[in-house]
Regions:
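N-terminal accessory segments
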Residues: 1-72
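Conserved nucleotide-state-sensing and coupling region of NTP-binding domains
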Residues: 108-153
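Contiguous, well-ordered alpha-helical segments that form the cores/surfaces of helical PPI scaffolds
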Residues: 60-64, 86-98
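Walker A/P-loop
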Residues: 70-92
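Hydrophobic/aromatic-rich structural module bridging two neighboring secondary-structure elements via a short loop
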Residues: 77-80, 104-110
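Post-Walker A helix-loop "phosphate-sensing" segment adjacent to the P-loop in P-loop NTPases
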Residues: 95-104, 127-131
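Short alpha-helical patches at coil-to-helix transitions and adjacent helical residues
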Residues: 56, 85-90, 112-115
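Short, well-ordered loop/turn elements at secondary-structure boundaries
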Residues: 70, 101-102, 152-153
C-alpha cells in the first residue's frame, strides 16, 4: 500500500498528524534501505549535488557486485576528472565500512599524503549526520587519525 495515496482527510487532526509523521519516517526508511544496499543510491544520498552519468551507473554496478561478493577483484581505469577517485577512494570505503563495520581497508595511492586526504574525507563522512541516517557505524573515539581509524563495532 502506498501511504501517500491514503485519504486521511476524515481522520481526527491528532491522528492525521501522526499519520503524516509515519509517512515521513517510512520515506526516510526507504531511502536508508536503498542507500545501504545500492552504492549509487548511497552516493546520491550523501552527495545531493552529484550529477549522474552512464559511466557512474556502470562503476556503481561493479561496486555493488564487489560488495555482494559476486566479484572479488576489480580494476578501474577511467580518464581523469570522471569521479574515479571520489568513488573508489572516498565513497566506496565509507559505504563498505557502513555495510561491514569490522571490515579492514587498505588505501594505496601514489603518495601517502593522498591516502591520508581520502582517509580524512571518509572519516568526516562517517562522522556526519547524513551518514548516521544511513548506517549506525561510528568511529572509535581514540582512533580518529585521518590515516588510521577504526569503527566502534
Amino acid at each position: 500500500m502506498n501511504l501517500n495515496q491514503v485519504d486521511i482527510s476524515k481522520l481526527p487532526s491528532d491522528v492525521r498528524k501522526q499519520f503524516k509523521q509515519l509517512r515521513v519516517m517510512h520515506a526516510e526508511k526507504k531511502i536508508q534501505n536503498k542507500a545501504q544496499h545500492d552504492f549509487l543510491s548511497f552516493v546520491k544520498t550523501v552527495w545531493p549535488e552529484f550529477i549522474e552519468g552512464a559511466h557512474h551507473r556502470h562503476i556503481a554496478k561493479k561496486f555493488n557486485d564487489l560488495a555482494s561478493g559476486k566479484i572479488t577483484r576489480l580494476i578501474v581505469n577511467m580518464p581523469p576528472r570522471h569521479t574515479k577517485s571520489e568513488f573508489a577512494s572516498f565513497l566506496l570505503p565509507a559505504w563498505m565500512v557502513g555495510r561491514q563495520p569490522k571490515l579492514k581497508i587498505i588505501q594505496a595511492t601514489h603518495t601517502g599524503e593522498l591516502a591520508i586526504r581520502f582517509g580524512r574525507k571518509a572519516k568526516h563522512l562517517i562522522d556526519s549526520e547524513e551518514y548516521a541516517k544511513i548506517f549506525k557505524t561510528t568511529l572509535q573515539e581514540d582512533s580518529k587519525a585521518a590515516g588510521r581509524w577504526e569503527t566502534s563495532q
